[in-house]
A protein has these predicted regions:
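Extended, solvent-exposed, turn-rich assembly/linker loops in the middle of proteins
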Residues: 30-100
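Short amphipathic alpha-helical segments, especially helix-boundary/capping motifs
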Residues: 25, 50, 138-139
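Long, contiguous amphipathic alpha-helices that act as assembly "spine/axial" helices in icosahedral shell
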Residues: 1-34, 57-61, 65-67, 106, ...
Length: 189
């Protein structure tokens, strides 16, 4: 494989790792965060978000990030209308999946579906069912992410003539204060 092809494969692998890293963080928040009181279908997006935020504030916390499923993020965009402010930087401008509303950063988590596996702070692998999760609201310092090994490289392959793209990462996740993270689920899917 030519170096340019391996470089492209490395870029793709890095993107996949980035997506997996986000999925694992979201799974940790969903697993270790506190369940929001409301579990009924969401009919008023703004009211629902404010109610969940109120739960965190009443627990002496604050919230500034909302990780949303794509379906809920669409509801946020419709509800917020012109009040939704996209976050501007090169990566965000190309995806359009992060913005500000109600004093919080909303992130569209494309991988927030099905079952997600992650390693918790003890090194145990957990599987989290995301089928009923609509969003996770939290304070950005409530999620600890610690990586103890990262490598991304293009190397000569020992299996064939050419180059091989390799990306590896070992990361642990922990919600350090469950009062600062609320998981909004809808009962029964």
């Amino acid at each position: 494989v030519e170096f340019s092809v391996a470089e492209e494969a490395l870029s793709t692998a890095t993107q996949e790792i980035r997506e997996g890293w986000m999925q694992c963080g979201l799974a940790c928040l969903a697993q270790e965060g506190t369940a929001a009181t409301l579990t009924t279908a969401i009919t008023d997006v703004k009211e629902d978000i404010i109610a969940t935020r109120q739960e965190i504030v009443e627990d002496k916390g604050r919230a500034n990030v909302v990780m949303c499923t794509p379906a809920f993020y669409s509801q946020v965009l419709l509800a917020a209308g012109k009040d939704f402010t996209p976050v501007m930087n090169d990566r965000i401008a190309s995806t359009g999946n992060v913005g500000q509303w109600l004093g919080m950063t909303f992130v569209e988590a494309n991988g927030a579906q099905g079952s997600i596996k992650y390693y918790d702070s003890t090194g145990a692998q957990k599987t989290v069912d995301m089928s009923t999760v609509q969003y996770v609201m939290y304070y950005h310092e409530a999620l600890s992410v610690i990586s103890n090994f990262e490598v991304a490289r293009v190397i000569d392959s020992e299996r064939f003539a050419g180059s091989l793209a390799q990306v590896e990462m070992n990361t642990g996740y922990k919600v350090t204060n469950t009062a600062l993270a609320r998981v909004r689920k809808v009962a029964g899917g």
